[in-house]
């Protein structure tokens, strides 16, 4: 990408020593039409933070651990703040709450093959919430319950 190429080019001249320097290099690398709303380095810094902190691995492990810990009737509620987290949460919830594709074709599904969980909710912020808290715009609340 042009961001990576520019970072490499600038580092050949001198080391990048501050986040402000890096932000400026990223800004220079992004076409003008993508610079209008928010600082163009925002998503790059988010991606770096996610990778350095292994956030998606920790997120996935945490959800799976929580699902293992709850008893019948217990619920796991997850608030996500960006699409990578939300997609991962949605996929995990789907995997544990649906009958296997092959088993769906059977006339009777054995009891031990029925899902242990049921998805209860997928909630986005209301218009009212967004009026006084615009930062909630990307938040999603997903809820799943152990049924067996």
Language model regions located:
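S-adenosyl-L-methionine-dependent methyltransferase catalytic core, i.e., the SAM/SAH-binding region
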Residues: 1-148
């Amino acid at each position: 990408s042009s961001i990576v190429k520019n970072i490499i080019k600038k580092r050949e001249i001198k080391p990048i020593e501050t986040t402000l320097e890096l932000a400026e290099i990223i800004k220079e690398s992004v076409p003008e039409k993508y610079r209008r709303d928010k600082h163009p380095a925002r998503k790059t810094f988010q991606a770096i933070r996610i990778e350095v902190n292994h956030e998606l691995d920790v997120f996935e492990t945490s959800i799976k651990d929580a699902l293992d810990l709850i008893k019948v009737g217990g619920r796991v509620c997850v608030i996500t703040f960006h699409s990578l987290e939300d997609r991962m949460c949605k996929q995990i919830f789907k995997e544990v709450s649906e009958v296997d594709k092959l088993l769906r074709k059977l006339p009777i599904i054995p009891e031990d093959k029925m899902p242990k969980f049921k998805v209860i909710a997928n909630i986005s912020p209301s218009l009212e919430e967004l009026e006084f808290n615009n930062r909630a715009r990307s938040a999603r609340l997903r809820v799943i319950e152990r049924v067996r």
